[in-house]
């Protein structure tokens, strides 16, 4: 039986780029290569798509596939070749995005797969977009009558023009200590604990480096 071709897509433009490399390396090591052919595609921090060839290293026991290693340590960009994402369907039967944060977990790359008519792993476009945006997901949870923690949404525009009012609102409705996080990031990137006003302002500034709200 002909082996299915799995496209492992990693990297990306988000602040979780490095986390994605670790995840992709783990997935590559775990997949049964007797059953599947793997096609590696890395996306740089600048958004450039690169096809990464299978790489072998030699030691006393012979040649070994070290592709997962070069992805994990970041040297894949040196061996990758320019790749047009519109050609993806020519090379893979199934896409497995192993990426985190914006541009992957928020429905955008899922939309690309849908347009290219490529089956893919993970949630669909709508579920990804809603789940990634913590403000939207909390509104939906509330409307469904589910219990959630108290929260306040601060946009970049509000923080820029009326930050003191935003801080006062957090102090009044949540208090200290509180946690501040970007609305559209995963892992623990951009998250801070604030125990006073100065820490809260610094936490808001940090979170807004990763997201507009």
Task: For the regions a language model picked out, list residue spans one by one.
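Active-site nucleotide/adenylate-binding loops and adjacent lid/helix of ATP-dependent enzymes
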Residues: 2, 6-10, 14-15, 22, ...
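ATP-binding N-terminal substructure of ATP-dependent carboxylate-amine bond-forming enzymes
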Residues: 1-121, 125-126, 130-132, 136, ...
């Amino acid at each position: 039986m002909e082996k299915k071709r799995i496209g492992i897509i990693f990297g990306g433009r988000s602040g979780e780029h490095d986390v994605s490399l670790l995840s992709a390396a783990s997935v590559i090591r775990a997949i049964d290569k007797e059953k599947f052919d793997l096609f590696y595609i890395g996306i740089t921090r600048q958004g450039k798509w690169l096809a990464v060839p299978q790489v072998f290293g030699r030691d006393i026991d012979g040649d070994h596939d070290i592709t997962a290693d070069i992805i994990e340590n970041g040297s894949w960009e040196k061996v990758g070749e320019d790749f047009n994402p519109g050609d993806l369907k020519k090379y893979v039967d199934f896409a497995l995005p192993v990426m985190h944060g914006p541009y992957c977990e928020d429905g955008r790359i899922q939309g690309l797969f849908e347009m290219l008519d490529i089956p893919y792993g993970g949630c669909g476009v709508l579920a990804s977009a809603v789940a990634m945006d913590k403000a939207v997901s909390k509104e939906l949870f509330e409307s469904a009558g589910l219990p959630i923690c108290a929260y306040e949404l601060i946009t970049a525009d509000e923080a820029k023009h009326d930050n003191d009012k935003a801080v006062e609102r957090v102090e009044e409705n949540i208090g200290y200590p509180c946690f501040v996080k970007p609305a559209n990031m995963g892992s623990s990137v951009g998250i801070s604990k604030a125990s006073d006003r100065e820490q809260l302002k610094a936490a808001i500034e940090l979170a807004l480096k990763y997201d507009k709200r």
